[in-house]
Swiss-Prot record:
FMNH(2) which is absolutely required for this enzymatic reaction, is provided by SsuE. Catalyzes the desulfonation of aliphatic sulfonates. One of its GO terms (biological process) is alkanesulfonate catabolic process. CDD domains: Alkanesulfonate_monoxygenase. SUPFAM superfamilies: Bacterial luciferase-like. InterPro entries: Alkanesulphonate_mOase_FMN-dep (IPR019911), Luciferase-like_dom (IPR011251), Luciferase-like_sf (IPR036661), SsuD_RutA_monooxygenase (IPR050172). Keywords: Flavoprotein, FMN, Monooxygenase, Oxidoreductase. This is Alkanesulfonate monooxygenase. PANTHER family: ALKANESULFONATE MONOOXYGENASE, ALKANESULFONATE MONOOXYGENASE-RELATED. It comes from the Bacteria.
Amino acid sequence: MSLNIFWFLPTHGDGKYLGTSDGARAVDHGYLQQIAQAADRLGFGGVLIPTGRSCEDSWLVAASLIPVTQHLKFLVALRPGIISPTVAARQAATLDRLSNGRALFNLVTGGDPDELAGDGLHLNHQERYEASVEFTRIWRKVLEGENVDYDGKHIQVKGAKLLYPPIQQPRPPLYFGGSSEAAQDLAAEQVELYLTWGEPPAAVAEKIAQVREKAAAQGREVRFGIRLHVIVRETNEEAWAAADRLISHLDDETIARAQASLARFDSVGQQRMAALHGGNRDNLEVSPNLWAGVGLVRGGAGTALVGDGPTVAARVKEYADLGIDTFIFSGYPHLEESYRVAELLFPHLDVQRPEQPKTRGYVSPFGEMVANDILPKSVSQS
């Protein structure tokens, strides 16, 4: 099975280390453009653009990067409760047309009650999922060209329609991740691809089985994806040393403050991430080569696959064997790590790469000339 490999745009900040300003990097449009163009040239299928008050607006970022990329798809957040589903459908169709069919959408219900209240959304966890189901039903039908009347508990529309359809038919694909039963019910009914954060394979297998069963009960099939960080190096020892360096500036106070802040979230997925490490920096390898160090201070995806290329590829294949065909990776800093993943991991996987245009480079594809005159030898694979 060919795998779809996506990268990540760090619109909330980037750097060499977690939890410190040391080694931090200014994330401006030029830097995001560098990462997007690198991902495009290296053969990543798309990029996930995060959402939330700590991030630049994902829609504007995606639109700004369309002219400087050729094949890269943009996985952009849909926020039920923050925007009307009919307006969101028009925006989605426009982005899909502007990008010539490179738009994908990620339904994000939100998990931070404080942030949601700041955006004017005052619904509890269950109510947010009720509203998200209504939002998605309307959004899908409008994008598919239907005239929609809908009288729901949270959303009511009358005569909603779309005049300018998207490039992708019947509409751009919808992605979604959530670990609660309400989230799985939504996924089974509404989405094309269900995402999970990087839990141990046994836990992921259980979630996949649950969603697959719920979807089958509705006569549907759902694809599956996973969101993970990656720390890949030429040797396993180098990879684990890089993982240690990533959290080398973290002190106990910073970890405690981060965990206290994340504890207010009502996201079941966030609670499952936190349970993997318990706020303790000891014993962070929670499954072979699955490291929970990122989650000590980062919300959302908090685990990384760590190892050399063949080792990480073997772990990726374990997840693929569960039915996962889409992997959304990231690494710190995101520009350099995109190259490491492409150079050290891709050769060991069957990666579904966008077709690249045939161009003639200004320099040879063999690396730097030896003594200005000799073509370097290729390294034998043994």
